[in-house]
Amino acid sequence: MVAHRATRRKRASATQLYKTCKLSGTCPEDVVNKIEQKTWADKILQWGSLFTYFGGLGIGTGTGSGGRAGYVPLGSRPSTIVDVTPARPPIVVESVGPTDPSIVTLVEESSVIESGAGIPNFTGSGGFEITSSSTTTPAVLDITPTSSTVHVSSTHITNPLFIDPPVIEAPQTGEVSGNILISTPTSGIHSYEEIPMQTFAVHGSGTEPISSTPIPGFRRIAAPRLYRKAFQQVKVTDPAFLDRPATLVSADNPLFEGTDTSLAFSPSGVAPDPDFMNIVALHRPAFTTRRGGVRFSRLGRKATIQTRRGTQIGARVHYYYDISPIAQAEEIEMQPLLSANNSFDGLYDIYANIDDEAPGLSSQSVATPSAHLPIKPSTLSFASNTTNVTAPLGNVWETPFYSGPDIVLPTGPSTWPFVPQSPYDVTHDVYIQGSSFALWPVYFFRRRRRKRIPYFFADGDVAA
């Protein structure tokens, strides 16, 4: 096995050591010689430079210039450089003749600047004359404008883009803005009413929220998952598990024994109940319903194995106690509120509105109960205030017929031009009670408005 070697820390450089130890005088000799260039290599270079000079050759400079003349290719001659002196303008030299004066004037006469005319001389000694004047008229300017006609015109343009909608112009003087209304009371009758306002103040610190906090929606609390495969299921039959669970694990503790909290125990070798062997914790109880019963559950943890470091390893056990079963819901027999005799299944109104749920009975209808007839009844009645008209029926079923008031339609005049009466025909109610007829399902099931439909009788059946 290769031993692990510690990482080697980098030593400080000579420059860093020289900066820290030079002031205290504790620098090693090799560090001082290297920084101050006192090594043997530095001394040999210093002594050799006293006898040799390579300054013009550019050796060791690193510039690559090749000295003053530069590099020359092998087998060729260097080019000749001719220095050209720049041309300068000639200086004019005036010759001095024998007859010229030897004194040179510094200022020529042409360079004298004339300052202009001379100062005039004033004559007389009388002095100046002072003239004073006095006026009694005040210096007031007449600013009254001339008589003229002035026309003043103004134009008011309302732009809806620059009008604040919340602002309402009240018919009174004052200042109106989007947030503040400063007004003064005026006399007269207006279309508004002044209502005294009251301040609804709440005593508080001033940091209360200005809006209500919405109550979050109903959140379903997840039920404890006590029936997983990781938990060992143990059924307890001792009732002491409900109020005194500690008596099943260890000896009683007269000082404290919580019934709705988690309990912790020290590992012991012997337990009063063998199902609670090596239990070190019992969690708080939970009531659940499973398979038609109320169940009292606690989750426990065992300490079967303990390591040298003190870590406890064990299974998790679900202890449950069935309190009582949930009885099934009792079935109650329902009784009808109305008797079976009050039935209107055989009553129909062919002219009534089909949308009506239950048509009423007419006072002029003639009802024939089926209990007094040996055959199926079929009764036809018409509501009218005039004569009776009897319509014969077929003798297929020998249906008895009772005459009653019939319908007499009003007739128009025989003279020309014919003017119909208003209304020409009135709406009549016809009630048919019995079971020996059939209504056409097209008109019976369709929800339509009130409408007159033709009808006729054939062999005792009514078809509409």
Curated annotation (Swiss-Prot):
Gene Ontology biological-process entries: microtubule-dependent intracellular transport of viral material towards nucleus; symbiont entry into host cell; viral penetration into host nucleus
Similarity-based family: Belongs to the papillomaviridae L2 protein family.
Disulfide bonds: C21-C27
Maturation and modification: Highly phosphorylated.
Function: Minor protein of the capsid that localizes along the inner surface of the virion, within the central cavities beneath the L1 pentamers. Plays a role in capsid stabilization through interaction with the major capsid protein L1. Once the virion enters the host cell, L2 escorts the genomic DNA into the nucleus by promoting escape from the endosomal compartments and traffic through the host Golgi network.
Annotated Gene Ontology cellular component terms: host cell; host cell endosome; host cell Golgi apparatus; host cell nucleus; viral capsid
Origin species: Human papillomavirus 56
Gene: L2
Subunit structure: Interacts with major capsid protein L1. Interacts with E2; this interaction inhibits E2 transcriptional activity but not the DNA replication function E2. Interacts with host GADD45GIP1. Interacts with host HSPA8; this interaction is required for L2 nuclear translocation. Interacts with host importins KPNB2 and KPNB3. Forms a complex with importin alpha2-beta1 heterodimers via interaction with the importin alpha2 adapter. Interacts with host DYNLT1; this interaction is essential for virus intracellular transport during entry.
Record-linked InterPro entries: Late_L2
Stated name of the protein: Minor capsid protein L2
Residue ranges of the motif Nuclear localization signal: 1-12, 445-453
Localization: Virion; Host nucleus; Host early endosome; Host Golgi apparatus
GO molecular-function terms, A-Z: DNA binding; structural molecule activity
Keyword field: Capsid protein, Cytoplasmic inwards viral transport, Disulfide bond, DNA-binding, Host endosome, Host Golgi apparatus, Host nucleus, Host-virus interaction, Late protein, Microtubular inwards viral transport, Phosphoprotein, Viral penetration into host nucleus, Virion, Virus entry into host cell
